[in-house]
Amino acid sequence: MSRVGKYPVEVPSGVQVSIVDGIFVAKGKLGELKLPLSQHIEAEIADNKVSVRPVGTAAPARMMWGTTRALVASMVKGVSEGFSKTLEVTGTGYRAAVQGSNLVMNLGYSHDIVYAIPAGIKITTPRPTAIVVEGVDKQRVGQVALDIRSFRKPEPYKGKGVRYDTETIRRKEGKKK
């Protein structure tokens, strides 16, 4: 069983953390994030460290212990450094560009795909075949990247589609004559 929860979270300089009415708040140079704490969890701030511990030994308390610690750690990292995911667009004529507050993609359909960029997320296209999603909230950055990828998932025969830059596509051999 994992014991992630027992390790305290280091708070870097430039990040302010507080607990107000059962809500953990992290403020940094990139923004502010809030996390409502479960009733099964106690959090304590001391010496630039955040400690999380369960209330009692019930199963829900032990389950939320490590989860809450991981969420707090990602919040602290998000407001200080931020998170980013890079997507690659592969295919003949496939490209992406940011126009105003929309991401416009040509992915081989008869129409362009227009994706409205959500608040709190920054999307850039350093090249027509690369999309960079950045933000302070790890979950939202991952969800936006997944939404963009789902418009044209990579197919296994030619590898065309939108994929994460770290993702490897398992290729299949075409049919033989």
Swiss-Prot record:
Keywords: Ribonucleoprotein, Ribosomal protein, RNA-binding, rRNA-binding. InterPro entries: Ribosomal_uL6-like, Ribosomal_uL6-like_a/b-dom_sf, Ribosomal_uL6_a/b-dom, Ribosomal_uL6_bac-type, Ribosomal_uL6_CS. GO terms for molecular function: rRNA binding; structural constituent of ribosome. One of its GO terms (biological process) is cytoplasmic translation. SUPFAM superfamilies: Ribosomal protein L6. Residues 156-171 have a biased composition (Basic and acidic residues). Residues 156-177 are annotated as: Disordered. GO terms for cellular component: cytosolic large ribosomal subunit. Belongs to the universal ribosomal protein uL6 family. This protein binds to the 23S rRNA, and is important in its secondary structure. It is located near the subunit interface in the base of the L7/L12 stalk, and near the tRNA binding site of the peptidyltransferase center. Part of the 50S ribosomal subunit. PANTHER family: 60S/50S RIBOSOMAL PROTEIN L6/L9, LARGE RIBOSOMAL SUBUNIT PROTEIN UL6M. This is Large ribosomal subunit protein uL6.
